[in-house]
Amino acid sequence: MRSFFVTGTDTGVGKTIVSCGLAAAFRQKQADIGVFKPFLSGVPRTHPESDTSLLKDMSQTALSHEEITPFEWKEPLAPYTAAMLEGKSVSMADVMAHWSKIKNRHECFIVEGAGGISVPLGENYLVSDLIKAMELPAVIVTRPDLGTINHTYLTVEYAKNMGIEVLGIIINGVRSRPGLDEKTNPSMIETLCKVPILGITPKLDHVSSENIQHMIEKHIDVSSFMNLTQMGR
């Protein structure tokens, strides 16, 4: 299996839920899976409800919180902005150095970005630049409702123009009683973007490890997804 990068059309679209669910589902199928979320803003990485803690718990990796998330910032802002407020900076070389230390600890890694694909992570580099530097294909998480066609298309086209391989799209957060927009958007997104919809996942009323894993296993063909990660360009 190849490692891959989970990015999104925006913040709050469900990248962590999707990443955690995939990690648990892959592990259930005996995959040797690791997780890497290099940046975290607004909450300590060791907090039991942090994205880092959830990723660690659901992947069951032996990597420490510090290895999973080497850079954390106090303010819930874009990493570059949050770092500047603390008088700090993280270079692309810093991130890649941490990645080099852990990338051979597991057969496959799910790497999660921060916010959308164009969020600034440091001076002169964005999430997209990190994806390129890591030489990973991307999975794009998007929301299901009105406006998502535009945001998703722009994200996919931008990724393609950057030379990033897009494995597919996961539409996350569909309501229990979906509106007409949520019913019609997936087919339009797939037609316009010309990349596969890997899954359409519902909005969780209660977020727990069990619910996340069950949701992913129910709404995404995990075996096909794993096969997709084994295919090169």
Curated annotation (Swiss-Prot):
Coarse class of the protein's main subcellular location: cytoplasm
Keywords: ATP-binding, Biotin biosynthesis, Cytoplasm, Ligase, Magnesium, Metal-binding, Nucleotide-binding
Chain positions recorded as substrate binding sites: S41
This protein's pathway: Cofactor biosynthesis; biotin biosynthesis; biotin from 7,8-diaminononanoate: step 1/2
GO MF assignments: ATP binding; dethiobiotin synthase activity; magnesium ion binding
GO cellular component: cytosol
Binding site for ATP: G12, V13, G14, K15, T16, I17, D51, E112, G113, A114, G115, P202, K203, L204
UniProt-annotated binding residues for Mg(2+): T16, D51, E112
Reactions accelerated catalytically: (7R,8S)-7,8-diammoniononanoate + CO2 + ATP = (4R,5S)-dethiobiotin + ADP + phosphate + 3 H(+)
Active site: K37
Cystines in this chain: none
Function: Catalyzes a mechanistically unusual reaction, the ATP-dependent insertion of CO2 between the N7 and N8 nitrogen atoms of 7,8-diaminopelargonic acid (DAPA, also called 7,8-diammoniononanoate) to form a ureido ring.
HAMAP family (alphabetical): BioD (MF_00336)
Protein name as catalogued: ATP-dependent dethiobiotin synthetase BioD
Lineage, opening ranks: Bacteria, Bacillati, Bacillota, Bacilli, Bacillales
Gene name per UniProt: bioD
